[in-house]
Regions:
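Fold-level recognition of mixed alpha/beta catalytic cores in primary-metabolism enzymes, strongest
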Residues: 144-207
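Gly/Ser-rich catalytic/binding loops embedded in alpha/beta enzyme cores
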Residues: 1-159
Length: 207
């Protein structure tokens, strides 16, 4: 257990260092204070010590900012729309229950209504590999954060390509599950009939 926790502490440090060194502020709308994540490592350690099965302990994630994370504002890239949720969206809660740790909220095309990654007052998210090119959207920040190695995985959404397009343009894996398999409660809707919560990772092996 101690090795796992030390690895998680190192992973948290590495994520924040990667974000700082990349100098790509447009990827993120909000980051948790590093001290909060370090405190959560101790909580994960206590759960492991109590015998909890935490298959995702050691993985660092990000959340597209149209999905609720308790204590972090949800903006959908529209500052005047911002609200502070008191509870995690079920998709986030399930991952936390499995030991995952989230460091912040990522940028997106406003209200998840774009496929280019440029329609945000928080900045146009540039492609991970060629900053002169678009990242794709609307889950632009989540895809680029994963491609740059700032996090192990990230949540996004897909209504009409918002997960698949940035995954393809940034050379990572993007999975759109069967609609209804993952709850969209706590997600700012673009289309209630079509919205899906998606996940990004650099390889399939992560899952």
């Amino acid at each position: 257990m101690s090795a796992t926790i030390e690895a998680l502490r190192a992973a948290v440090r590495n994520s924040y260092q990667s974000i700082e060194s990349a100098q790509r502020p447009e990827v993120w709308i909000a980051l948790r204070p590093q001290a909060e994540d370090e405190a959560e490592v101790d909580e994960i350690a206590a759960r492991l010590a109590a015998g909890a099965n935490l298959p995702l302990a050691g993985l660092i994630g990000a959340v597209k900012d149209n999905i609720d994370v308790a204590g972090l504002a949800t903006t959908a890239a529209a500052p005047s729309f911002s609200y502070l949720p008191s509870a995690d969206a079920p998709a986030v809660a399930r991952l936390r229950d499995a030991g995952a740790l989230f460091i912040g909220k990522t940028n997106l095309d406003q209200f998840a209504t774009g496929l280019v990654g440029t329609r945000s007052p928080y900045g146009a998210v540039r492609n991970a590999w060629d900053p002169d090119r678009i990242s794709g959207g609307s889950s632009s920040g989540s895809a680029v954060a994963v491609a740059l190695g700032q996090v192990d995985f990230a949540l996004g959404t897909d209504t009409a390509g918002s997960g698949r397009v940035p995954a393809a343009l940034n050379g990572i894996v993007g999975v759109k599950p069967t609609r209804g398999l993952v709850s969209t409660t706590g997600v700012v809707p673009a289309s209630r009939r079509l919205d899906c919560v998606t996940v990004f990772a650099r390889t399939l092996a992560l899952g």
